[in-house]
């Protein structure tokens, strides 16, 4: 097995590892969702919100790992073609040598930077790769969008068969529940007034 073939093997192995990490994140996300339901059932919205943030973070991280796995896999395919055709340039071989340590680190930013270097060795950079990079940089934010958290909380409450607004402890009712309650109160007041007028 030549050096280049060893590096190619490491690339393919890294793609599998990234894919495995993505699946692990999926598992963690499901576990966090189960914790959300339990917290909502106990009426503990603060804990439910924390688990919702964790679930969304795991989901985003899983997507990032999956995306990087696909990207490393695509580079491996290009290396395979270059090796098969005997067209491995010196500069390409240099970049490939630096891959091993970076791939072992499983650091998405370092792997991404390395993939950038490698892709520049190929003349045809497809548009798809650029789109992936843009999407990755926008999804690696550490903050969790609150609307996603709220939607996930509502979804978990629905699955648990709970009314999120009705079962919340006092002082934590959502604005939706409050506006519905006040509308119902207005309607009741009007009916009562009509009944009084009839008597």
UniProtKB/Swiss-Prot annotation:
Keywords: Cell cycle, Cell division, Coiled coil, Cytoplasm, Endosome, Membrane, Protein transport, Transport
Interaction with VPS4B: annotated segments: 183-199
Coiled coil location: 10-48, 178-199
Protein name as it appears in the record: Charged multivesicular body protein 1B1
Subunit structure as annotated in this protein's UniProt entry: Probable peripherally associated component of the endosomal sorting required for transport complex III (ESCRT-III). ESCRT-III components are thought to multimerize to form a flat lattice on the perimeter membrane of the endosome. Several assembly forms of ESCRT-III may exist that interact and act sequentially. Interacts with CHMP1A. Interacts with VTA1; the interaction probably involves the open conformation of CHMP1B. Interacts with CHMP2A. Interacts with VPS4A; the interaction is direct. Interacts with VPS4B; the interaction is direct.
Positions of the UniProt region annotated as Interaction with SPAST: 174-199
UniProt keyword annotation of Cell division present: yes
Subcellular localization, as worded in the UniProt entry: Cytoplasm, Cytosol; Endosome; Late endosome membrane
Region (Interaction with IST1): 132-156
Region (Interaction with VPS4A, MITD1 and STAMBP): 180-196
Organism: Mus musculus (Mouse)
Main location: cytoplasm
Record motif MIT-interacting motif, residues: 186-196
Disordered: annotated span: 167-199
Record-linked InterPro entries: Snf7_fam
